[in-house]
Amino acid sequence: DPLRDQFTLVYKLPEEKIKDRPAPISYSFIDRNNNIWLCNEETLYLYNTHTLQTLQIKNEIGEDITDIEQIDDTHFFIGTEQGIHHAELKNQGLHLLPCDKLDNLPIQINELYFHRPSRKLFIGTFERGIYVYDMNTKQSTQPNMSLTDVSITRIKPLNNKELLVATDGAGVYKI
């Protein structure tokens, strides 16, 4: 018997919740707690791959999610088409945490990358370049780069000290 891929359905969104939606999921994410997040503007479905249980929670942000970056077991940064939010997942709910330097940054988020050693969040935007939020100083800055009118599509580590930043047509940059 030759090797072949085999797919088994392990979770299906509730039909009554998605029947009138042309795109029932705007974003999906797998966290370090074995949860697969299936997100839309109204609801977050967290399917745990170990317990096989699903938690449905209200999307307290009320916006389409574009990216999620996990900080620790319970804290996340969540990017949307309108901005970025700091949240905590606890007591079977998503709780927004105040963060004035990010809450007042009304930009479309394309990509998030959290650099754990420095505790800095790199924020890739749509046509506004890249921002850096330092969790130690609680400050948000924009690096002195010529990326201020560029869309950032991906941020990935090159090594322990450098990141690669991919853009939508303007090349790949190293920070």
Q: Can you say where each PLM-predicted feature lies in the sequence?
A:
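Carboxylate-rich, polar loop motifs that coordinate divalent cations or form catalytic acidic clusters
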Residues: 1-175
